[in-house]
């Protein structure tokens, strides 16, 4: 059963906590993690580009010239795709759906694998508490400097906290997420994961049946 140190905001080790093997001691599978990340990124994608077909462009109802006798190629509408300003063939459409289905068990397994990897490489940190009595970005940045890990970190808290969010949102190398919003795609972007100690209990409860 893996165990990690618990730190306070001064960077001092104040204890140790054990982690469950089923969640933090899982053997990694690069291919599974990759497929889940690709799917989660695809599911975030929205379609903005939208081209018009010849049926959606205004005008072009009249035949530009008669069928025969002009010496020119026959044309039926100035909104045909070969005309400048005509409809687009096979262009991007806003109704295109990029979403990819992910099995729940596969998504959970990939999540446990990435967390297990962070634990095995000493990139998983537990902090006893983030005090919010001084809700300043400067305060949170100061904690990040003294804690024993890299500055670029994903911080996991048990539930939504608007005060902490305000403290973190201007720090470009720190992202704040709640336990139930923790995704593999977010985890792989940050080399270090920081769990506030109550988040561990919330995580274990959320995935107790996994």
Q: Where are the regions that the model predicts?
A:
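Extended polybasic, low-complexity segments that bind anionic RNA or targeting/receptor surfaces
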Residues: 1-46, 92-210
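A short, flexible low-complexity segment enriched in Lys/Arg and Gly/Pro that occurs
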Residues: 30-68
């Amino acid at each position: 059963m893996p165990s990690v140190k618990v730190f306070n905001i001064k960077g001092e080790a104040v204890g140790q906590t054990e982690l469950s093997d089923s969640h933090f001691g899982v053997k990694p599978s690069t291919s599974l993690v990759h497929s889940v990340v690709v799917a989660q990124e695809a599911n975030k994608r929205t379609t903005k580009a939208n081209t018009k077909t010849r049926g959606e462009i205004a005008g072009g109802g009249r035949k530009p010239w008669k069928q025969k006798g002009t010496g020119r190629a026959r044309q039926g509408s100035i909104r045909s795709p070969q005309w400048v300003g005509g409809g687009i063939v096979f262009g991007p459409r806003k109704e295109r759906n990029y979403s990819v289905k992910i099995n729940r068990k596969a998504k959970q397994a990939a999540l446990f694998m990435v967390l297990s990897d962070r634990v095995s490489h000493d990139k998983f940190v537990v902090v006893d508490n983030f005090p919010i009595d001084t809700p300043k970005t400067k305060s949170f940045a100061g904690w990040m400097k003294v804690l024993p890990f890299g500055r670029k970190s994903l911080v996991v808290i048990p539930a939504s906290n608007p005060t902490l969010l305000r403290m973190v949102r201007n720090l470009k190398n720190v992202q704040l997420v709640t336990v139930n919003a923790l995704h593999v795609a977010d985890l792989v972007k940050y080399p270090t994961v920081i769990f506030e100690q109550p988040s561990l209990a919330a995580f274990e409860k959320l995935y107790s049946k996994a």
